Amino acid sequence: MFSPCTVKEKRSTLRSVAPNPESSVIPPIPLPSRRYKTRHIDALCSLMHLCLLRKDYPRASRAFSLLLRSKSVDISKLWNIGLEILNKVNPEASSEYMERLIARYPARPSINNSYPNRNAEHFFPAYIMLLIQRQEYNKAMKLLDEYLLLPPYNQNPALHEYSGMLCFELAKEEASESERTKWIEKAKYNFSNAGIDVEL
């Protein structure tokens, strides 16, 4: 048995050794250095470009998907690479990819001040060209009719030109002469808005 004095001495010794909860500071958990994160991202970018050069699109797609998961990667700078990969790996997903980009980076300066050169006004013409390449003329025409009513799209000459070309293409598919004439008149109107004179 310990004597009372010995127990008191041991308690006082433990108190002197134990950290004071009021003065103790919990050390921060060490996180990976930003330097290492940057290296990993650079390595993934290099791998993705190498796979694209070798036309290894499935592996390039995996590298791109890993880059998308990183918070420090700005997708608006890599959107065209992502579109190229999707067109090779999963063409059906390309339209959804472009629609999400347009929704994520709206062409409204009050909302999207950080991306003046990478917003929906920049992505939308590429989306229309994608639909034209796939011969989805009706869908492209419907989108243009909707967006050309809104600024800043109605001030984009390229979109008016695309609309004019689509009107000519849709006029070819019309059996009715009156409907064909309507499409041709609409094409002339859009070309004039694009600053192009068309003689028919």
UniProtKB/Swiss-Prot annotation:
Put simply, this protein is called RNA polymerase I-specific transcription initiation factor rrn11
Per UniProt, subcellular location reads as:
Nucleus
The gene is rrn11
Domain of life from the UniProt record:
Eukaryota
Print the keywords alphabetically. Answer: Nucleus, Transcription, Transcription regulation
Instruction: Tell me if Transcription regulation is a UniProt keyword of this record.
Output: yes
Disulfide-bonded cysteine pairs: these are none
Q: What does this protein do?
A: Subunit of a multiprotein complex essential for the initiation of rDNA transcription by RNA polymerase I. Binding to the DNA template is dependent on the initial binding of other factors.
Concerning Pfam families, the annotation shows:
Rrn11
Which one GO biological process term can you cite for this protein?
nucleolar large rRNA transcription by RNA polymerase I
The record's annotation in InterPro entries points to: RNA_pol_I-specific_init_factor, TIF_Rrn11, TPR-like_helical_dom_sf
A cellular component term from Gene Ontology for this protein is: RNA polymerase I transcription regulator complex
The Swiss-Prot or TrEMBL record annotates one GO molecular function as: RNA polymerase I core promoter sequence-specific DNA binding
